[in-house]
Regions:
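Conserved "right-hand" nucleotidyltransferase catalytic core of DNA-directed polymerases
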Residues: 7-11, 15-26, 32-199, 285-322, ...
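Short, low-order "capping/linker" segments at domain edges
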Residues: 343-350
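Activity-critical C-terminal alpha-helical subdomain
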Residues: 1-5
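Helical catalytic core of nucleic-acid polymerases
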Residues: 6-9, 27-34, 155-284, 288-289, ...
Length: 350
């Protein structure tokens, strides 16, 4: 939808499939064919179909185009060809620099981003002191991580897994993942299916724990936290809400980007490791509920099926976790939950 896009070479036919068009056609004649009059008419019809598909794609892009037009006019800078991540990053940089936080160093050849380089990171220094785990397998993961020193973040916690109540939990820099694969779960009068997702997990964790890339100083969490509050004041669907969401969510990803002014791998590991371990703390308390079964854990939330008569207990456990972490949990209830794996599922909301 914009030129700064890994998929910009995607063919029109692939777009037609993605847009679920009823009729997808290929060129009706080999390239270079000398056409008859009837074949020319057929080619005109084929070309018209492609024009309609192109217009359809344009219409699908109008909200994003208008979003960028509003931002370009409002902030007097060209956002038209920015991808979503770059929109958020540039907005946060703009706000930091307005507050006197330098994000770049000027040199005779241009500017270079300010960064915090880390020759090595002791993961024991990264983990929050209030992370306490009870289940032997989760404790093993905690102890393994705490004893580890890394020199780069990529692949640093690859292939780290444990099995709890028959479910395999996979840890990594991309977050915690687990799922009861290739299953269909149905709620009824006795059992409920719920997802408890952490509200804006990574941004919220950075804010409540006062985390920041070291080189950006004490102003960063103040500005970041203020942006979080501002976003909640704008209705969903407004350009302001979308802009602030992109700015908040893009910071974590850029904290591990060597070309970014947010680069600080210690900050990156603080968020991803604690994010996973805090979810484990929630899981190990929830599974104490009789007949509660975890079915899906994916980076920022947990899904489970459990007897409805224990709802007050489940709510109390979630309330305890919220009070401990200062993070919020949102609840979605499903009548049916069918999944291939933790990233591919269909949920029918109640």
């Amino acid at each position: 939808k914009h030129f700064d896009n890994m998929a910009r070479a995607t063919s029109l036919k692939t777009l037609e499939i993605a847009m679920r068009m009823d009729d997808i056609e290929d060129l009706p004649f080999p390239v270079g064919t000398v056409l008859t009059r009837d074949e020319i008419e057929e080619l005109h019809r084929y070309n018209l179909h492609d024009v309609i598909a192109t217009i359809y794609f344009y219409v699908r892009c109008i909200p994003e185009i208008e979003f960028r037009e509003v931002l370009t006019k409002r902030y007097d800078r060209n956002f038209m060809n920015h991808n979503d991540t770059k929109i958020g990053k540039d907005y946060l940089i703009m706000k930091l620099e307005e507050s006197g936080v330098k994000c770049f160093i000027k040199t005779p050849t241009g500017r270079i981003p300010r960064q915090t380089l880390r020759p090595s990171i002791k993961l024991g220094d990264v983990i929050f002191p209030y992370v306490k785990l009870e289940h032997p397998e989760f404790r093993r993961i905690h102890e393994t991580l705490a004893a580890k020193t890394i020199t780069e973040t990529k692949g640093s916690i690859k292939d780290l897994t444990c099995i709890v109540d028959g479910l395999s939990y996979k840890f990594g820099t991309g977050g915690l993942h687990a799922s009861d694969d290739c299953k269909i779960f149905k709620a009824d009068d006795e059992y409920a299916i719920e997802m408890r997702d952490v509200t804006s997990y990574y941004p919220s964790m950075a804010i409540v724990n006062n985390l920041r890339p070291l080189h950006l100083g004490d102003q960063f969490p103040l500005i970041y936290g203020d942006m979080f509050k501002q976003r909640r004041s704008y209705p969903k669907g407004t350009p302001e809400n979308a802009m602030l969401k992109l700015a908040l969510n893009g910071t974590y990803g850029d904290s591990n980007n060597i070309y970014s002014p947010f680069y600080d791998p210690f900050f990156c590991m603080q968020i991803t490791l604690n994010g996973q371990l805090l979810l484990c703390m929630l899981v190990e308390q929830l599974i104490k509920t009789p007949n509660l079964r975890m079915i899906n854990i994916n980076t920022d939330g947990v899904g489970f099926i459990y007897p409805r008569k224990y709802r007050s207990h489940v709510d109390a456990v979630c309330g305890w976790w919220e009070k401990l972490t200062l993070l919020g949990l949102e609840t979605e209830e499903y009548s049916l939950f069918a999944q291939r794996d933790c990233n591919n599922y269909i949920g029918v909301e109640v």
